[in-house]
């Protein structure tokens, strides 16, 4: 009898040591909704939390090719625990609950030896969508999450070195998202280095890419993020072509002075995330952009705006950027063609900062010359064309040293 009881106890103990993972994959170009994960595996007491330290990276390692003969074990990287394994890009922030992942093209990047499934645990109050890059290549699958979910963002065979980047597709207005943890078999190195160039974009739906992947016949209700992919916006495409890091601060309907919201642009984006609290964005310790690109005005004109309102708020934004970062960041002010009066407003604004000699540049371009997506907004082809125009402008003005 004692032997039988002992056998049962041993079986239970052995079973409890196995971690069961739940996730989902998908075919190319399929939108993948997440499955529920065992959140209890992530829960740790404050006493158990300690800083995670990634191993030093061998610069000679090649993603997808360098292999290890080590036996890899399963690990959970808790994002509420400080560590040096993840590179945070844009307005992505570490908190005691996880990584705040609210803004368009917020991103994280990590590298290490991995095998089997790599599962990202996410909590989002509404639909959020993500693009994943593995070893520099964009994965065709679109990943989506709502609630507390787990996403199998990659599956590997063999014990190879890989680099993964996860980028949010939707703007801050649609959902608020926390990255909770990463579960994988293997281990991570120190975070990848920053790219040499960093560009920050300020705008509305034309910059956040609302409607760019929708059908032209669809009215695109403004609470549905499925029509939007900021990783196919002119802003992100431009930075990818330059091998630069990107930050997008943009919201559909917002104006620099008026627009479709009660407040103006700077009221919202001088906060780290206005949907969470009114805590101001802290410039200290933040990465300083090499170029700032502003594209605001469409919503001001759709509801009405005076020259005094527009120019005054535009000056506030430029001063906010330059005084906050303590640097005369070159400003590219993108705009559409709106006639003589508006051109005079822009000339006054440009002259105030000394024009191109003062690092203030005006770029006029169309916004949907190559077709529309949902809600009458530019489709991906139009964003590609805008990106090409912006790249040519940056090269012509020699804005990259």
Q: What do these predicted regions represent?
A:
Residues 1-2:
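N-terminal hydrophobic targeting signals that begin at the initiator methionine
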Residues 103, 218-304, 337-343, 377:
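Conserved SGNH/GDSL esterase-like catalytic core that processes O-acyl groups on lipids
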Residues 198, 245, 328-330:
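Residues at the starts of beta-strands that form the adenosine-phosphate
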């Amino acid at each position: 009898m004692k032997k039988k009881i002992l056998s049962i106890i041993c079986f239970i103990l052995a079973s409890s040591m196995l971690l069961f993972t739940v996730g989902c994959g998908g075919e190319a170009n399929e939108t993948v909704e997440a499955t529920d994960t065992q959140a209890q595996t992530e829960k740790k007491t404050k006493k158990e939390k300690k800083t995670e330290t990634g191993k030093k990276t061998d610069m000679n390692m090649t993603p997808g090719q360098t292999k290890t003969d080590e036996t890899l074990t399963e690990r959970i990287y808790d994002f509420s625990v400080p560590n040096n394994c993840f590179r945070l890009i844009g307005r992505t922030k570490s908190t005691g609950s996880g990584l705040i992942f609210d803004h368009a093209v917020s991103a994280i990047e990590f590298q290490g030896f991995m095998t089997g499934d790599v599962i990202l645990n996410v909590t989002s109050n509404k639909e959020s969508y993500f693009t994943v890059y593995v070893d520099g290549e964009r994965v065709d699958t679109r990943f989506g999450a709502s609630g507390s979910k787990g996403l199998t963002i990659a599956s590997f065979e063999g014990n190879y070195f890989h680099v993964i980047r996860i980028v949010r597709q939707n703007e801050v207005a649609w959902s608020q998202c926390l990255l909770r943890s990463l579960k994988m078999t293997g281990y991570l190195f120190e975070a990848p280095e920053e790219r040499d160039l960093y560009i920050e974009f300020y705008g509305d739906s034309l910059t956040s890419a609302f409607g760019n992947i929708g059908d032209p016949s669809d009215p695109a209700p403004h609470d549905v993020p499925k029509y939007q992919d900021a990783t196919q916006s002119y802003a992100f495409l431009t930075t990818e072509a330059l091998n630069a890091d990107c930050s997008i601060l943009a919201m559909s309907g917002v104006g620099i002075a008026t627009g479709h919201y009660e407040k103006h642009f700077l009221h919202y984006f001088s906060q780290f995330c206005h949907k969470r609290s009114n805590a101001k964005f802290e410039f200290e310790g933040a990465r300083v952009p090499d170029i700032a690109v502003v594209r605001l005005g469409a919503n001001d004109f759709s509801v009405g705006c005076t020259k005094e309102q527009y120019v005054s708020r535009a000056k506030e934004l430029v001063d906010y950027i330059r005084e906050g970062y303590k640097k005369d960041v070159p400003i590219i002010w993108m705009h559409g063609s709106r006639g003589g009066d508006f051109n005079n407003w822009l000339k006054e604004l440009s002259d105030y900062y000394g024009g191109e000699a003062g690092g203030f540049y005006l770029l006029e371009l169309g916004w949907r010359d190559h077709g529309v997506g949902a809600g009458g907004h530019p489709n991906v082809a139009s964003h590609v064309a805008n990106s090409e125009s912006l790249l040519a402008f940056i090269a012509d003005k020699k804005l990259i040293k």
